[in-house]
């Protein structure tokens, strides 16, 4: 499971202005914050809006953006200046892969270290849509039988048992924490043991929320390498990329499929 909220794309005007600095071609720019009537929108691209204003990329700037984009990363520095903010809720196993993209990204996350005991654990806190279990409507053979041969345990049951254990550790942690605040020395000495139970039992399917900042160049690298990934979360992320303003800059054909040509500004 991956959920994206509060997307905001900024920096178009500055990126376009900087894109034209090398050849001092600012006079050729035809993008601006303004309202464009429907009859006049042909060739223009709506990139951003704020209150009653809209930022439209004109055909001159769009053409230059495409040519610079196709000329390679040395020429398309403007893509690093188009900044994207978003909130992502995703499982820890996906965040481990996202964290390989260190350059050009910043993230503030909900802290499992500080806030792991802030609320009771529930099944909705985990990405478990692929786990077998009759409760999920899956008619599967049991994976494990109990030693008595009476009950059957499905993968979803293992997660349920883990959640029960996490909540028991949370209950004891909060109890010992309260006693420690009142000066109980035994509680002070042992409260962290129950915190460790939660930290080390927490499955990688646990969903974490982060506020992320990245840019169009980073998204181009992600899209190229992850759009056919086996994780559903990457498919959701790449679908979101395709819905961004002027996403052709990100999702366009591979540079190796485009013949290099002289860039005219």
Q: Where is each model-derived feature located?
A:
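Family-specific signature for flavin-dependent thymidylate synthase
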Residues: 1-263
């Amino acid at each position: 499971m991956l959920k994206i909220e509060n997307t905001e794309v900024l920096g178009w005007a500055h990126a376009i202005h900087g894109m034209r600095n090398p050849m001092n071609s600012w006079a050729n720019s035809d993008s601006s914050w303004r309202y464009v009537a429907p009859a006049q929108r042909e060739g223009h691209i709506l990139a951003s809006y704020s209150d009653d204003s809209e930022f439209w990329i004109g055909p001159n700037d769009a053409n230059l953006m495409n040519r610079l984009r196709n000329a390679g990363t040395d020429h398309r520095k403007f893509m690093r200046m188009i900044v994207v903010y978003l909130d992502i809720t995703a499982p820890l196993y996906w965040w481990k892969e996202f964290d390989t993209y260190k350059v050009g990204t910043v993230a503030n996350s909900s802290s499992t270290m500080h806030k792991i005991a802030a609320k009771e654990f529930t099944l909705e806190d985990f990405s478990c849509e692929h786990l077998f279990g009759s409760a999920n409507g899956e008619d599967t053979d049991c994976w494990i039988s109990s030693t008595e041969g009476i009950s059957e345990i499905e993968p979803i049951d293992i997660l349920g048992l883990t959640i029960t254990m996490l909540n028991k550790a949370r209950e004891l942690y909060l109890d010992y924490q309260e006693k420690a605040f009142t000066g109980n020395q035994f509680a002070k000495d042992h409260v962290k043991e129950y915190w460790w139970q939660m930290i080390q039992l927490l499955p990688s399917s646990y969903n974490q929320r982060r506020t992320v900042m990245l840019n169009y160049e980073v998204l181009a690298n992600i899209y190229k390498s992850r759009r056919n990934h086996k994780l559903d979360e990457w498919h959701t992320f790449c679908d979101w990329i395709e819905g961004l303003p002027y996403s052709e800059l990100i999702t366009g054909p591979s540079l190796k499929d485009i013949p290099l040509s002289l860039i005219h500004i």
